[in-house]
């Protein structure tokens, strides 16, 4: 697995509320060990996942969300 900001189609982040459990739930549903609400410059608050399966897309730096 890998760590990163989990991506929606088109390289968009999943927005979140700092301190909420939403990202942890989302990441675990996708097969990660855990997740939390982080901050991605240029995108704002975004879900970060730890040990996400390689088949699940993560945000690619420099690519704009379409």
Curated annotation (Swiss-Prot):
Domain remarks: Has the structural arrangement of an alpha-helix connected to antiparallel beta-sheets by disulfide bonds (CS-alpha/beta).
Protein name: Alpha-like toxin Bom3
GO BP of this protein: defense response
Keywords, sorted A to Z: Disulfide bond, Ion channel impairing toxin, Neurotoxin, Secreted, Toxin, Voltage-gated sodium channel impairing toxin
SMART domains hit by this protein: Knot1
Family to which the UniProt record says this protein belongs: Belongs to the long (4 C-C) scorpion toxin superfamily. Sodium channel inhibitor family. Alpha subfamily.
Organism: Buthus occitanus mardochei (Moroccan scorpion)
Location relative to the cell: Secreted
Example of a GO cellular component annotation carried by this entry: extracellular region
Stored InterPro entries: LCN-type_CS_alpha_beta_dom, Scorpion_toxin-like, Scorpion_toxin-like_sf, Scorpion_toxinL, Scorpion_toxinL/defensin
SUPFAM superfamilies per UniProt: Scorpion toxin-like (SSF57095)
Keyword Transcription regulation set for record: no
Disulfide bond annotation, renumbered to this chain: 12-65, 16-37, 23-47, 27-49
The keyword Plastid is annotated on this UniProt entry: no
Predominant location: secreted
Domain LCN-type CS-alpha/beta: 2-66
Stated role: Alpha toxins bind voltage-independently at site-3 of sodium channels (Nav) and inhibit the inactivation of the activated channels, thereby blocking neuronal transmission. As it competes neither with the classical alpha-toxin AaH2 nor the beta-toxin Css2, this toxin is an alpha-like toxin.
Entry's Gene Ontology molecular function annotations: sodium channel inhibitor activity; toxin activity
Tissue specificity annotation: Expressed by the venom gland.
Organism domain of life: Eukaryota
